[in-house]
C-alpha cells in the first residue's frame, strides 16, 4: 500500500491521451456486441438444441469447426466486405466483426443450456395454448438466463479487450477504442510506466463492473436449476 496515495498518474494519463472518448467508444462497441450476440444466438441455439435435423447438425458442426481456425485469417476477406459496405473506419463495422467472432462460442454455450431445459415444460406450455414464440419468450428464455448472462459477459469482455481488428479497421483518432489508444503511450523514448499503468488499470474496471452486474444472475440461475433438478 503506498504511503502517499495520489491521482497524479491518472490525471497525467487523461492529459496525454483521449482516454475518456476512447473508453466511450469501447463501451458502445462492447454493449452493442453483447446485445446483438445474445439476440441472434438465443433463438439459433434453441433451434439447434430442440430440432435434430440435418440443418441443425450441420450448424452444430460449423460451430465446432469454426473454432479450429485463427480468426486473424479472416481479416482480409472481412476488410474487403466492410469496404464494399462502406463500413471501414466505422464503429458499426467493428461491431459486426465482433458479433461474427463471438457467435460460434455463444451458440455452443447457449445450445448446451437449452438442452438442459426439460422439454416437458415446453410441452405443458403447448397444451395451455402457447405457440412456439410465446413458449420461447415466456418459458425457455427465463430458464436460459444464466447462459444468456454468461454469453453477454463473454461478448462484452471480448469486444472490450480486442485490439487487432480495432487497429486495422479504425483509422480516425476519434473512433479508436481504448486498447488502441493505450498503445499511444509507447514512444521512441520508451513507455512512461506510471501514466500507462494507471490507464491500463482503469481499462480493466468496466469489465469487472459488468461481471459484478451479471454474476448474481449467473449464480442465482445455477442455484435455481440445481434446486429444480
Curated annotation (Swiss-Prot):
Coiled coil: none annotated. It is found in: Cell membrane. The chain crosses the membrane at residues 27-47, 62-82, 91-111, 150-170, 194-214. Keywords: Cell membrane, Membrane, Transmembrane, Transmembrane helix, Transport. The keyword Phosphoprotein does not apply. It is a multi-pass membrane protein. InterPro entries: BP-dep_ABC_trans_perm, MetI-like, MetI-like_sf. CDD domains: TM_PBP2. GO terms for biological process: transmembrane transport. Signal peptide: none annotated. PANTHER family: INNER MEMBRANE ABC TRANSPORTER PERMEASE PROTEIN YCJP, MALTOSE TRANSPORT SYSTEM PERMEASE-RELATED. May participate in oleandomycin secretion during antibiotic production. This is Putative ABC transporter permease protein ORF1. It comes from Streptomyces antibioticus.
Amino acid at each position: 500500500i503506498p504511503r502517499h496515495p495520489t491521482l497524479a498518474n491518472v490525471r497525467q494519463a487523461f492529459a496525454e491521451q483521449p482516454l475518456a472518448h476512447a473508453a466511450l467508444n469501447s463501451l458502445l462497441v462492447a454493449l452493442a456486441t453483447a446485445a446483438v450476440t445474445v439476440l441472434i444466438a438465443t433463438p439459433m441455439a434453441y433451434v439447434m438444441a430442440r430440432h435434430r435435423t440435418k440443418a441443425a447438425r450441420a450448424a452444430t458442426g460449423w460451430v465446432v469447426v469454426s473454432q479450429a481456425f485463427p480468426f486473424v485469417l479472416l481479416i482480409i476477406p472481412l476488410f474487403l466486405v466492410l469496404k464494399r459496405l462502406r463500413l471501414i473506419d466505422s464503429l458499426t463495422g467493428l461491431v459486426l466483426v465482433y458479433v461474427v467472432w463471438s457467435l460460434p462460442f455463444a451458440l455452443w454455450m447457449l445450445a448446451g443450456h437449452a438442452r438442459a431445459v426439460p422439454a416437458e415444460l415446453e410441452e405443458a406450455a403447448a397444451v395451455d395454448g402457447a405457440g412456439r414464440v410465446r413458449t420461447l419468450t415466456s418459458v425457455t428464455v427465463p430458464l436460459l438466463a444464466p447462459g444468456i448472462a454468461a454469453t453477454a459477459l463473454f461478448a462484452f469482455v471480448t469486444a472490450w479487450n480486442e485490439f487487432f481488428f480495432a487497429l486495422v479497421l479504425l483509422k480516425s483518432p476519434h473512433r479508436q477504442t481504448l486498447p488502441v489508444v493505450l498503445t499511444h503511450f509507447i514512444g521512441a523514448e520508451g513507455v512512461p510506466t506510471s501514466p500507462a499503468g494507471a490507464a491500463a488499470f482503469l481499462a480493466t474496471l468496466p469489465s469487472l463492473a459488468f461481471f459484478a452486474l451479471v454474476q448474481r444472475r449467473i449464480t442465482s440461475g445455477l442455484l435455481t436449476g440445481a434446486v429444480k433438478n
